[in-house]
Amino acid sequence: LANSRYDLAVIGSGPGGYVAAIRASQLKMRVAVIERDLPGGVCLNWGCIPSKALLNSAETMEAIRGAGKEHGIEVGEIKLDFKRVIARSRQAADKLSKGVLYLLRKNKVDYIEADATIAGPHTVALRPAAGKAAPPAEAVEAERILIATGSGEKLFPGMALGDGVMTSREALLHDRLPKSIAIIGAGAIGAEFGYFYQAFGAKVTIVELEPQMLPGFDAEIAEELRKSFVKRGVKVLTGHGFKSMAREGEEWTVTLDAAGAPKTIAAEAVLVAVGRNPLSLDMGLDAAGIEADRGYVKIDDSFRTTCPSIYAIGDVARPPLLAHKASAEGIAAVEIMAGVREPGFDLLSIPGCIYCEPEVAMVGLSEAQARERGIEVKVGKIPFRANGKAVAINQTEGFVKIVAGKEYGDVIGCQIIGHHATDLIAEIVLGRTLETTTAELGHSVHPHPTLSESIMEAALAAEGEAINF
């Protein structure tokens, strides 16, 4: 290793880095992946996977609670072992993390445990990572370098973690269920953990500075989720900014700013979910003349940075901060390097998903965004209460909304809130890739009874041809 030179050195083994490395190896490149933490990065170990395991436990709890009332299945006293809930999520993360290491080795990618910094256009310096053995060399040389370091949790200035104050990372390990929790931020992380904690009986208050939950999402979707959360007993405070917090006895007193008027709430625990920062600091960007904007590494349409031999993908390069976007960018970047793909990447075709219940999914432009761009649109909207499968399984919350071009019916965007929304959105993603129209979607026969029929029905609604609503 000390004397070897790679075609590509990838810094970070998350969903962007490990996928890029494997694709590069398939394209006959000699590849090394450098990781300072665990194989799979944040997504597999501290994000997507363990959090979905927790949400599955929450859904199971809700199903058990409703078994008698909904299905006539009486159960005895429900006992919760919250430590096992957390342990199960860690097992899922550990299993997939080991799977990533296996895939890298299977594809002949060298995996190096080290803390990496860029020392030049073709050099990555290696240092011992925290808690890890010394790396096998002091540096790695590569024809090209790919930065895939991801992002980290954002905190308010001066805020210290511990004593019940957490980000999502700490929450994934916190094996004592708080009686009450204040969640600062009503984006994807805030919504998912809000649902999780309320399902297990915690008193949940979600605080959001913006006037709606899920800032940036379709307003109708956000309002539907707010109503669902309130119905479940979650207190949602939109238009409230965080000011300060202080420990008082067994609880935290959180002071908020509501249009200039102070307001306080008390909670045993506080979860900070106000976004993430790209992990580009202390990376040695200056050593290779790499420019960044607010921490995001600047890239062109080939994912190349301001240093011609160094590329960047995923959270460290640009929003949206999504694992599947990082993976897709990783594949695109190495294929462009190999000359088998043209530059360019369609960010509008990247779906965004939130895995609380009801689930939320979107792709493309919302109705408001399309109109702001001067696009004439037609909209088809179908509630799940008009869907036979949804009624049969008692999952009638939410709706499907398809936004299409007025003249040709080209699918501009879709927003879904409801059961399995995050699975249903894939049909629209494929449709956008194939430049499908609402007429084509609506006239494609969907199996009955399925939730996917709501996609067909919403497409028909956009054409003025809805049958079941």
Residue ranges and their predicted role:
Residues 9-16, 22-37, 49, 53-60, ...:
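Flexible, glycine-rich terminal cap/loop adjacent to redox cofactors
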Residues 2-6, 22-29, 34-177, 205, ...:
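Glycine-rich flavin
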Residues 21, 25, 194, 198-199:
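Gly/Ala-rich phosphate-binding loop of Rossmann-like dinucleotide-binding domains
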Residues 17, 190-191:
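N-terminal Rossmann-fold NAD(P) dinucleotide-binding loop
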Residues 9-11, 116, 139-150, 183-184, ...:
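Short hydrophobic core segments
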Residues 2-14, 177-187:
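Beta1/beta-strand and adjacent pyrophosphate-binding region of the FAD-binding site
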